[in-house]
A protein has these predicted regions:
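N-terminal secretory signal peptides that target proteins for export/translocation
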Residues: 1-3
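Metal-dependent de-N-acetylase/amidase catalytic core
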Residues: 6-9, 19-34, 109-258
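Metal-dependent phosphohydrolase cores
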Residues: 12
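Active-site rim/loop-helix segments in enzyme catalytic domains that contact anionic ligands
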Residues: 20-125, 154-155, 246-255
């Protein structure tokens, strides 16, 4: 199928989706949020995850690593088991599925074997929309995650929409330039409950809004989007365009990026 025709077909599918759980006889979109560690998808895009699940789409939270290095003083196998349980609990709250890709926290490798593995995974999943880390980030695992996903997107001839999420902007994500803001007010409590499921990471109401910056980011992006709380996303150039608000039935159209 020529690229222009395929691109238009994707846009038509996205524009016509707007599904709810009650319209299960209509096609659903496959949406993947791919984070480097357990808690990345939930804190960076938990609102999108919750809204997409509530709209009836097939939504999966994908973890590149299992967070083995994320609990100081705890051996890697035990830490991984704890963080897997926390991620599964968080995703149950959001109503999404989980996939763990098995890379090692703090030692993620980018090589031809991993490129092939990610490309094969995405080819098998056949997603319509993928959200992953912004490429300019102080955390090496975040950068590796972006690299692997972006390479797979190119290898798959840019078949799916590719968007980026921010992680603790200014501390981890650097120079984030959003193209879309998504009103998450309707699912804010659910997003927070999912984030707080990551007990081992010390995510509490106080730290969520304080040292981890997530609450501050939600309010700031809300100001930009002319609502109270929002998440921001950046579309990769040459990616199919998704109107996230229309797709997820969250109300007015997103405010375009500056």
């Amino acid at each position: 199928m020529p690229r222009v025709v395929r691109f238009c077909a994707v846009l038509l599918l996205l524009a016509c989706s707007g599904l709810s759980a009650e319209s299960a006889d209509q096609p659903r979109l496959r949406i993947l949020v791919i984070g480097a560690h357990p808690d990345d998808p939930e804190t960076c895009a938990g609102g999108l995850l919750a809204l997409a699940a509530a709209a009836g789409h097939e939504v999966t939270s994908v973890y590149l690593t299992t967070g083995e290095a994320g609990i100081p003083g705890t051996a890697a196998p035990a830490a991984a088991a704890t963080r897997r349980r926390e991620a599964e609990r968080a995703c149950a709250i959001l109503g999404v599925k989980t996939v763990f890709l098995g890379e090692i926290d703090g030692a993620t490798v980018v090589d031809q074997a991993r490129y092939r593995k990610m490309a094969e995974f995405l080819r098998d999943q056949k997603p319509d929309l993928v959200v992953t880390h912004w490429p300019i980030d102080t955390h090496a695992d975040h950068r590796a995650c972006w690299n692997l996903v972006y390479n797979a997107w190119v290898a798959e001839n840019r078949r799916f929409a590719l968007y980026y999420m921010e992680a603790m902007s200014g501390h981890q994500s650097q120079g984030f330039q959003p193209t879309d803001r998504l009103d998450i007010g309707a699912v804010l409590e659910r997003k927070h409950e999912a984030a707080f499921a990551h007990v081992s990471q010390g995510i509490t109401p106080a730290t969520y809004d304080g040292e981890f910056l997530h609450g501050q980011m939600e309010r700031f992006r809300g100001i930009e989007a002319r609502c109270t709380y929002a998440e921001a996303f950046a579309r990769q150039d040459q990616s199919p365009i998704v109107d996230l608000a229309a797709l997820l039935k969250t109300g007015p159209r997103n405010v375009p990026g500056q």
